[in-house]
Design a protein with these regions (language model features):
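Cys/His-rich short segments
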Residues: 118-171, 175
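Helix-rich, typically C-terminal accessory recognition domains appended to large enzymatic cores
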Residues: 123, 335, 343-381, 391-500, ...
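Secondary-structure transition/capping motifs at alpha-helix termini
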Residues: 1-2, 36-43, 64-67, 88, ...
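Intrinsic disorder at enzyme termini
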Residues: 473-549
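Structured secondary-structure scaffolds
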Residues: 1-48, 103-107, 151, 158-369, ...
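Phosphate-backbone binding interfaces of nucleic-acid-interacting proteins
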Residues: 531-654
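N-terminal catalytic cores of NTP/NDP-binding nucleotidyl/phosphoryl-transfer enzymes
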Residues: 2-71, 97-112, 117, 134, ...
């Protein structure tokens, strides 16, 4: 019988920098869904890739002294790049697309021309607000505090000749799709899209640019490159063979069952994407699912904020499957989740070491201890076995109901309720007591077999989340391929009675939280520091100062006669200065973290003298010493402005 098909995609990621744990979260979740459908017997196509064109890539490449192609090649295919990350995380994608692939570029040109030929793309001029990092145009009303509503960065005015897509033409059809079907999930995203974009009125979309060249040329007007979101969105079709000869399974897998995307790009996938598909008369994807963000310290994790978490570090420290499990066990898939290293360690210790690992270790250890690694054939059932068997055999249906809704966390909750029940069953049946009585060994074998069957079924359902670990568990309990099937995940008694059992090493040793946190935090801080710009300067002041006003400021050379720390202050130094007037001047300055007092005695500095006195720690400060400040690798640096000692006290700067 021919298998049912299932097509699922991640967004294709923008390789302007290394990917972080937020990208990993999305890809691991999509991988788990793909593995779940394969377990059920579906013929799965799982696509991921990279979105490699656009102004931001062009700018970053120029800053790095590289061509755009070389720049993206390094991030995608280089050491510890995108492909290496997905290999490390055991991602089972069937296909990987790069939007710089020749077949994709040629197909996008054909698709763009189709929309032009049918009148849905026309030439005009664009004037509006543009966010370079997001490659997005915005109207004034869509800005939040004058900034990009997606990323919060500055926008700039952009005006250029451009091609436009008649998005407004499809507003009613898109609204119907959103409001009257289950196309967009979770349902909360529908209200966002309708209220924020549809109701205010969809404007036609700018779909070409002339201000940069790193993109797919419009073949009939080469001065234009195709807008990055047209280029990006059609990857889901070109990767199956639409308008190209590279692949030939578009008819087999399209439409997609699920596009899994972060909530910040739901607008493109739920409004623009279906409208463009309608334009070229292609079926719409069945579902778009907008998952939440991993937030850290209350804000979105992003490369620009410097608060990203490196998945390589976590996977190498805790193991790939532990990280995969944490991401899917801890955060509800449709909502934001607060990421912390403490939560990661707690989840590993509680769920993996104490619950799953302990169940497997205790059970296999007792089979080895009491029966040499293989149970005898006889069985002796007891009333207390019934509840465990009933709970275990009902697990698959409860798990399936949650997984089919993409509620991955809830699916794992169902499994761990059974694991908790199995650990309680051990306490109820006290197999260590049965082991002391030779006449109770058949009952002991029954208890241990019941535990092994529980482990088998739980492991089958955990496989999409922790594939490598589940292979190890199956090997420990002697479960062959038949024992691991979806069909047998609700059938009791499948594990052979005489299966070879081997305890082996513990699956998840407990993590020393204090020691590991100290090591991890130090490593992550070093990474963040290394990723910061070498030098950061304070923003330049745009407001001009009247020259006559500037001349009123009295800058003078001053000799430092004495310098001492101010009591009860960690920051303040008290300077006694010769300003040339014949009277000592006292100025306080908060630079103690940069200088010791004795370093500065006898030096010549610059001060502005005609500021009104200001009390600091009860001491009047009459003026201000001039310093230069900047940041190096995120650390603030300060240099007191010292000048040649031959300059006399009181000399005016001009």
């Amino acid at each position: 019988m021919e298998k049912k098909t299932f097509y699922i995609t991640t967004p294709i990621y923008y390789p302007s920098d290394k990917l972080h744990i937020g990208h990993t979260y999305c890809t691991v979740a999509t991988d788990a869904i793909a593995r779940y459908k394969r377990l059920q017997g579906y013929d799965v196509m799982f696509l991921t890739g990279t979105d490699e064109h656009g102004q931001k890539i062009e700018t970053k490449a120029e800053e790095a002294g590289m061509t755009p192609q070389a720049f993206v090649d390094r991030i995608v295919d280089g050491e510890r790049g995108v492909r290496d990350l997905w290999k490390l995380m055991n991602i089972s994608n069937d296909r990987f697309i790069r939007t710089t692939d020749d077949y994709h570029c040629a197909a996008v040109q054909k698709i763009f021309r189709k929309m032009y030929d049918n009148g849905d793309i026309y030439k005009g001029a664009y004037k509006g607000k543009y966010c370079t990092p997001c490659e997005s145009f915005w109207t004034e009303s869509q800005l939040v505090d004058g900034k990009c509503p997606d990323c919060g960065r500055e926008v700039h005015d952009a005006e250029e000749e451009a091609y436009f897509f008649r998005l407004s033409k499809y507003a009613d059809k898109v609204r119907h799709l959103l409001e009257d079907t289950d196309f967009l999930q979770p349902r909360s995203r529908v209200n966002e899209m309708v209220n924020n974009f549809i109701k205010p009125g969809l404007e036609d979309l700018c779909v070409s640019r002339t201000s940069f060249t790193w993109g797919i040329p419009v073949d009939f007007d080469p001065g234009h490159v195709v807008y990055v979101w047209v280029d990006e969105l059609f990857n889901y079709c070109t990767a199956l063979g639409l308008d190209n000869d590279r692949y030939h399974d578009f008819d087999k897998f399209w439409p997609a069952d699920y596009h899994i995307v972060g909530k910040e790009i739901v607008r493109f996938h739920s409004i623009i994407w279906p409208a463009m598909l309608m334009s070229v008369d292609l079926p719409l994807p069945k579902h778009v699912y907008g998952h939440g963000w991993l937030v850290i310290d209350g804000g979105k994790m992003s490369k620009s904020k410097g608060n990203v978490v490196d998945p390589y570090v976590l996977a190498e420290m805790f193991g790939v499957d532990a990280l995969r499990f944490f991401l899917l066990r801890t955060f509800p898939f449709g909502s934001d989740g607060n990421f912390s290293n403490e939560l990661l360690i707690s989840t590993i210790n509680t769920d993996l070491a104490n619950k799953l690992g302990n169940l497997v270790s205790r059970t296999t250890g007792m089979v080895e201890k009491y029966f040499g690694g293989a149970l005898p054939a006889g069985r002796e059932d007891a009333p207390e076995d019934c509840d465990l068997k009933k709970t275990v055999c009902a697990l698959r249906d409860r798990y399936e109901a949650e997984m089919d809704k993409l509620q991955l966390q809830n699916g794992l909750d169902e499994i761990f309720r059974v694991i908790d029940r199995a650990n309680k069953y051990i306490d109820e049946t006290t197999p260590w007591t049965l082991g002391k009585d030779e006449s109770r060994h058949i009952r002991l074998a029954t208890v241990l077999y019941n535990l092994l069957e529980t482990i088998r079924i739980c492991t089958t359902l955990l496989t999409p989340v922790m594939p490598a670990t589940c292979e190890k568990i199956f090997a420990k309990i002697g479960a062959d391929e038949t024992c691991r099937s979806w069909a047998n995940a609700n059938v009791w008694g499948v594990l052979p009675a005489d299966a070879a059992i081997a305890k082996g090493e513990n699956l998840f040793p407990r993590v020393d939280a204090e020691e590991t946190l100290e090591k991890l935090n130090a490593l992550q801080e070093a990474q963040r520091k290394a990723a910061r710009p070498a030098v950061e300067l304070e923003p330049y002041v745009a407001e001009e100062v009247d020259f006559d006003t500037f001349l009123k400021s009295d800058f003078r050379a001053v000799k430092i006669k004495n310098c001492e720390a101010v009591k009860k202050s960690d920051k303040l130094l008290k300077f006694t200065l010769d300003d040339g007037s014949g009277t000592d001047r006292i100025i306080l300055s908060g630079i103690h973290q940069y200088y010791e007092p004795e370093q500065l005695i006898g030096k010549t500095a610059i001060a502005i003298l005609n500021l009104p006195p200001r009390k600091m720690m009860g001491i009047p400060s009459c003026g201000m010493l001039i310093s230069a400040v900047h940041k190096e690798k995120g650390e603030e640096k300060l240099h007191l402005m010292l000048i040649d000692d031959s300059v006399p006290a009181g000399a005016k700067l001009c």
